[in-house]
C-alpha cells in the first residue's frame, strides 16, 4: 500500500496485482476511488456529508439531508429511491422506498409499537401490526389488524422460551448457560435437542431416537457429520478456512482450489475463471466451456455455451433487465417508476402487462387475451384470483388462512 503525507491510503494492490487508487479533499473525505477500469467519484457538502456519488460516469446517486444531518431522500439518476421523515427524537416515522410507504409509531423508549401501511381498501394508512414490549425491551406480543395475537416469553437473558401463536399452540425453548438453544418442544410435544462443545459448535442434534453428530477441527471448521440416517460426510480445509476436500458417504471425493483472493478455481473437474470484479468469466467442464460477459456495472450481458449458442442481456441504469435475446428470439421488458415490470414483449409484440396495488402486490396480469385479477388481505396474503377472457370467467380460486 502507498500513503500520502496525511497517512491516507492512496494506492493499494491486492494479491492478484489489481490496483485501487484513492483521492481525498482537504477535510479527509474520499473524493475518488478507482479499481481497474471502475471509477467512483464522491461529492460532499460543507458538513462532509456525501451528497453525490457517480459510478462509472453514468450511475448517479444523490443524497439530501435535513438541518440535523439526517438523510431525508436518496435519488438515482433523478428518480427518488428512498425518502424518510423523522420525529423530534430522530425516529424514522415514515419511509417510502420505490413507491411503498411505511409509517412507524414508537413508545417512550423508542421501541416501534405500530407499523402502518396503505390500506388495500382505500389507500389510507392503517396499523397492520402492533407490538408490545416488556421492561427489558423484548417484544412480548404481536397483534395484527385482524386481532390475531402472537405472544412470547423470555428468560433473564432475553432468550425466547415460549411462543404462543394465534391459535393458542405453544412452542417452548430451552438454553444452556452460554445461551445456545438446547431444546425445542413443538405444540405436538415433538422434541428436538441440541448439544454443543466448549466453542459453541453444535456437536449433536437429536429427534426422538434419531441423532446427527458433528465434529470440528481446532479452527472450528466442520470436518465430519453423520446424519440421522447414518450417512457420513467429511471435509478438509486450508489455512484460510476454505474447504479443499469433500468426501461423500459413498466415498466419492471432490477437491477444491482457490486463487489468492479466495475465489474458487476448481471443484472436482470443473474449472473457473474470474475478472477483476469477481464476476465469473468462464466455467469449464469435460473440455466444454460456458463464457460470460458483463457491463461496467457488473450486469451480465452475454452467455456463450459450449455449443456456441449465445444469450444476450440488456439492462437499464437502475439494474432492471430490459432485454433477453436468444438467436432470433427477443424478450423485452419495460418497468414502472417503482422498478416493477410493466409490460413484456416477444419479438416486438406485447405479450403480457401488469398492474400493481398500493403495496406493490401484483393486481392484474393480462396475457394472451386472458386477464388474471388478484385480491389480497391487509397482511398481503393472496385471498383470491380470477381468470377472465372478455366478459367470461374462466376460473376462480379463493384462499383461507388459519386464524380467520
Where are the model-predicted features located?
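Beta-strand elements of repeat-based all-beta scaffolds
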Residues: 1-14, 18-55, 59-144, 148-165, ...
Amino acid at each position: 500500500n502507498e500513503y500520502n503525507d496525511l497517512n491516507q491510503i492512496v494506492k493499494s494492490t491486492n494479491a492478484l496485482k489489481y490496483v485501487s487508487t484513492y483521492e481525498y479533499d482537504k477535510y479527509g473525505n474520499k473524493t475518488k476511488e478507482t479499481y481497474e477500469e471502475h471509477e467512483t467519484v464522491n461529492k460532499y457538502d460543507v458538513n462532509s456529508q456525501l451528497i453525490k456519488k457517480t459510478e462509472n460516469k453514468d450511475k448517479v446517486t444523490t443524497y439530501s439531508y435535513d438541518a440535523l444531518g439526517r438523510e431525508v431522500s436518496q435519488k438515482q439518476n433523478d428518480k427518488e429511491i428512498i425518502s424518510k421523515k423523522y420525529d423530534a427524537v430522530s425516529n424514522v416515522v415514515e419511509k417510502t422506498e420505490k413507491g411503498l410507504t411505511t409509517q412507524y409509531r414508537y413508545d417512550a423508549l423508542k421501541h416501534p409499537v405500530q407499523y402502518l401501511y396503505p390500506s388495500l381498501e382505500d389507500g389510507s394508512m392503517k396499523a397492520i401490526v402492533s407490538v408490545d414490549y416488556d421492561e427489558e425491551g423484548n417484544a412480548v406480543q404481536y397483534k395484527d389488524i385482524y386481532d390475531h395475537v402472537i405472544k412470547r416469553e423470555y428468560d433473564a437473558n432475553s432468550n425466547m422460551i415460549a411462543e404462543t401463536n394465534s391459535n393458542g399452540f405453544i412452542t417452548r425453548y430451552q438454553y444452556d448457560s452460554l445461551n445456545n438453544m438446547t431444546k425445542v418442544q413443538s405444540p405436538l410435544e415433538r422434541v428436538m435437542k441440541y448439544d454443543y462443545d466448549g466453542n459453541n459448535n453444535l456437536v449433536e442434534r437429536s429427534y426422538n431416537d434419531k441423532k446427527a453428530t458433528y465434529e470440528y477441527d481446532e479452527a472450528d471448521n466442520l470436518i465430519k457429520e453423520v446424519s440421522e440416517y447414518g450417512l457420513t460426510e467429511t471435509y478438509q480445509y486450508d489455512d484460510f478456512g476454505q474447504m479443499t476436500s469433500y468426501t461423500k458417504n459413498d466415498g466419492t471425493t471432490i477437491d477444491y482450489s482457490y486463487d489468492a483472493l479466495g475465489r474458487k478455481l476448481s471443484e472436482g473437474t470443473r474449472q473457473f475463471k474470474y475478472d477483476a470484479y469477481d464476476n465469473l468469466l468462464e466455467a469449464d467442464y469435460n473440455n466444454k466451456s460456458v463464457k460470460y460477459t458483463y457491463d461496467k456495472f457488473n450486469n451480465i450481458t452475454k452467455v456463450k455455451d459450449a455449443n456456441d449458442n449465445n444469450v444476450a442481456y440488456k439492462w437499464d441504469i437502475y439494474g432492471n433487465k430490459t432485454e433477453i435475446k436468444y438467436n432470433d428470439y427477443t424478450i423485452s421488458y419495460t418497468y414502472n417508476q417503482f422498478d416493477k415490470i410493466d409490460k413484456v414483449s416477444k419479438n416486438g409484440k406485447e405479450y403480457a402487462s401488469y398492474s400493481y396495488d398500493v403495496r406493490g402486490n401484483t393486481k392484474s396480469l393480462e396475457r394472451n387475451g386472458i386477464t388474471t385479477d388478484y385480491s389480497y388481505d391487509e397482511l398481503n396474503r393472496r385471498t383470491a384470483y380470477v381468470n377472465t377472457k372478455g366478459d367470461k370467467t374462466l376460473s376462480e380460486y379463493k384462499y383461507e388462512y388459519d386464524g380467520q
